[in-house]
Amino acid sequence: MEASGEKAAVVRRLMEAKEVSGKTFSGIAAETGLTNVYVAQLLRRQAQLKADTVPALRAALPTLTDDLIELMMQPPFRSYHPNIVHEPAIYRLNEAVMHFGESIKEIINEEFGDGIMSAIDFYCSVDKVEGADGKDRVVVTFDGKYLPYTEQKSEHMMSRPTRKTS
């Protein structure tokens, strides 16, 4: 597990590489074929860099050092500072999900059945669009695999020895 101080130091170095490049998360995403949110997750040590993505990320952020790449390829300790929920943009995102959550859940149930949206097999992006009134709008897309709840039949429980009935 990464100590929070070590993680913060690595994140600072990764964000410096982004700053030096002069590129946005969306710009780096366009060059790497990743989503802009995933690029941000990589640079914040919330996602693991995969080997096949290294060349594209190095090209997009040429000041990334070998040791940073090596660290990025290790499974991260996915966490956040508890005070982050008080940051206004994050607070409003949380508020929106909580406010619309019950309705979203009911629509998922109607459209798919009893289940949830995965946050593991998941894609997320943030886009800027012009609204009907000509003002900027934020589009946050959550694209997660549907996972149905399963009926828990003991015969499907592989950790149990096979029972023989007489």
Curated annotation (Swiss-Prot):
Keywords: Lyase
Pfam families: Cyanate_lyase (PF02560)
GO molecular function: cyanate hydratase activity; DNA binding; identical protein binding
Lyase in keyword set: yes
Enzyme class: lyase
EC number: 4.2.1.104
Lyase among keywords: yes
Active site: 92, 95, 118
Catalytic reaction(s) noted: cyanate + hydrogencarbonate + 3 H(+) = NH4(+) + 2 CO2
Record-linked InterPro entries: Cyanase, Cyanate_lyase_C, Cyanate_lyase_C_sf, Lambda_DNA-bd_dom_sf
Any Gene Ontology biological process: response to salt stress
NCBIfam families: cynS (TIGR00673)
Function: Catalyzes the reaction of cyanate with bicarbonate to produce ammonia and carbon dioxide.
Similarity section: Belongs to the cyanase family.
UniProt-recorded name of the protein: Cyanate hydratase
